[in-house]
Amino acid sequence: MFRALLPYYGGKRKLCPIIFKKISEYLPREKWAHSVFVDAFLGSGAVSLYAKAQGFRIVANDIAERSVIAGKVLIENNETLVTDADLHRLCFPNGGGSGIIEKEFVPDVFTRRHAAFLDTAFANAKRPLDQYLLLKYIFAIRPYSKFSSPNAFNRPMEDGRFDEIKQTYTKHIKDNLKPPLAILKTEKATVNVGIFSNGHQNQISKKDVFEFVEEAEGDVLYCDPPYAGTLAYENEYQVLDKILGEEMKPKSPFSSDGGMEALGELFEGCQKFPLWVISFGNAGGKNELAKLVGIVSKHRKCEAKEFAYQHCGAVASEAHKQKSREWLILGHNAN
């Protein structure tokens, strides 16, 4: 199921069993099929997808189009799968000439061969399902699913200077040499394993998070905001946003050094939700658990767990790995 997700660096797929075990202590599992799981920061969709599989009806939100597309494909969509005919339709020449990808992202992000294909395919992509498949394609050809280090890989790859590419990129050389249709077929299989029905009409929206929590109704509110003092998603994934026609957004207030205060403001409008579940991290030692517990405790009783967890393990420094901690906060009104 999780193979269907975009490999965001802040994804929570490994934490889902822990998150939902804690939820079961406050909301029994036998009630989940009749309960609503509200996800204020959808991101990759890992937690909402897991909640969908557990039987919750999902109401989720994100401000980024890439996440909204993921939600429409994996959360709202209960039955429509990617077919081989869809793949061939994306590959069909449309006479559009060079597009934004070939003009702006060669050679720093894509080789010309892949850029030209992606321009054609995105022009043919008429549904969120098509767009999502192409986002999966992009991550499949990006080294370590990141969008940096053009001098280490993309420029020598485009020029055929393979001897200048470190051996750690050997797999990524092979990935980039695959024909587009072969990549699409692989990603088709991964997307389809994440598409299923849970018997509910699940809902995805694209709203400011303050507006969303004011309008949403549900039993569990899950918040996994950008962590204060960390790399902003708007910067890390600006290539994807530009390809999807999004205007460059300012850095989220939740990513700033004062991000915890922004989260405190959000909680002011969340009293109607019986259970809060909050994922957060120490940003390699920049954030303090006690501060977040204090913010949540202003509104309700609070339980906190801290554990070691690595994001981007393949590229993070050893020092950062040793310092990184993940937190799970539960705010409840139980006696």
Q: What annotation goes with each model-predicted range?
A:
Residues 1-38, 46-47, 53, 136:
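S-adenosyl-L-methionine
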Residues 35-96, 103, 122, 132, ...:
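SAM cofactor-binding core of SAM-dependent methyltransferases
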Residues 37-51, 60-64, 207-209, 214-235, ...:
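Conserved proline-anchored active-site loop of SAM-dependent methyltransferases
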Residues 48-52, 69-72, 214-218, 231-238, ...:
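A short acidic (Asp/Glu
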Residues 108-221, 226-236, 247-249:
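SAM-dependent nucleic-acid methyltransferase catalytic core
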